[in-house]
Regions:
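Conserved N-terminal entry element of GNAT/NAT acetyltransferase domains
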Residues: 1-15, 141-167, 298-301
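Helix-adjacent hinge/juxtasegments
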Residues: 69-86, 98, 222-239
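Conserved catalytic-core motifs of GNAT/GCN5-like acyltransferases
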Residues: 104-106, 122-140, 257-259, 275-291
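Conserved active-site tyrosine of GNAT-family acetyltransferases
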Residues: 23, 116, 121, 175, ...
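Conserved GNAT acetyl-CoA-binding A-motif
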Residues: 95-108, 248-261
């Protein structure tokens, strides 16, 4: 095997779109080479108020036969009228039409957890103290061929629901603002901050790999980590993780967490001291998605 060429690491919280695409593209190429090409499609359910303004809804994506729900928000004035249930049902119905076998989401709200469990979701994993003093739940639901829930009579004409697939949508900002306000009394300000480590070969401006993540509620999430074949098994991946851990500690983080597929890097992460706290089977079908974490504050994981 040829010796890995020297590389450089660069930390930034203001990555360019091109740099983000380079890291994401490299990971997609690796997954495609392993027989798992990305088939991601956005999925959104928009909730409009009487003035036609987007007031909430659901934002997510489908891929590898699963629906991932990133945000779900209904304004307080429209809650308890069955809209949340209807929004979930619409998203699940579309996911089934796309061939999805399951849905997943995350929440640190006990109220949201109860709502999801009422809708048929079960807890697949938890992280304590994320945000501090709270528990972060990963919930999943198997999607059978179940018809969507009927429109709730109590909702009346107060709101309408529409679906969209746009990559960028005003719905996202509405959901983020709504959830941030809802979470504030429980977890305080989220303190979101993007952090990226780009790996470049000497003399090359274009990144060939790296690590992309963010800080949220004093936890560092490793969203993407990829290195080309000739730069693996030389300690660079472990060095990237250590840089992320040092960055997390310097920022006052409690821990670091990530997810990986069974055909990717679970043994590597476990060797670095991470432990599995949750698993979703058949994601993608025939394989598993593992969630791993590592405490950085000295507390037992």
């Amino acid at each position: 095997m040829p010796e890995p060429r020297p590389v450089a690491l660069a930390l930034t919280d203001t990555p360019t779109i091109a740099e983000e695409r380079s890291v994401r593209g490299a990971l997609r190429e690796a997954d495609a080479a392993a027989g798992f090409p990305h088939d991601t499609r956005p999925l959104a359910v928009l909730l409009h108020d009487e003035a036609g303004k987007v007031a909430g809804g659901l934002w997510g994506r489908t891929g590898w036969s699963w629906l991932t729900i990133e945000s779900l928000a209904v304004p307080p004035a429209l809650r308890r009228a069955g809209l949340g249930t209807r929004i979930l049902a619409m998203a699940e119905e579309e996911a089934r039409a796309r061939g999805c076998i399951g849905a997943r989401l995350e929440t640190c709200s006990p109220e949201a957890r109860r709502f999801c469990e009422t809708a048929g979701y079960v807890v697949s994993g938890t992280i304590e103290d994320c945000p501090p003093g709270q528990t972060r739940f990963t919930l999943t639901k198997r999607l059978g061929m179940v018809p969507a829930e009927p429109w709730p009579e109590a909702a009346g004409p107060r709101a309408t629901i529409t679906r969209s697939e746009g990559e960028w949508d005003p719905l996202v900002g509405v959901l983020e603002d709504g959830l941030t306000g809802f979470n504030m009394p429980f977890g305080g300000h989220h303190g979101f901050r993007a952090v990226n480590f780009a790996v470049r070969r000497p003399g090359d401006a274009k990144p060939v790999g790296g690590l992309s993540g963010h800080v949220l509620y004093r936890w560092f999430f490793v969203k993407l980590l990829y290195l080309p074949e000739d730069l693996r098994r030389g300690g660079l991946g472990a060095a990237l993780l250590r840089r992320a851990e040092v960055e997390a500690l310097a920022g006052g983080c409690i821990g670091i967490w990530l997810d990986t597929f069974s055909f990717q890097a679970r043994p590597f992460y476990e060797k670095q001291g991470y432990r599995v706290f949750g698993t979703i089977d058949d994601f993608p079908p025939g394989h598993s998605r593992h969630y791993l974490m590592k405490r950085l504050d000295g507390a037992r994981a």
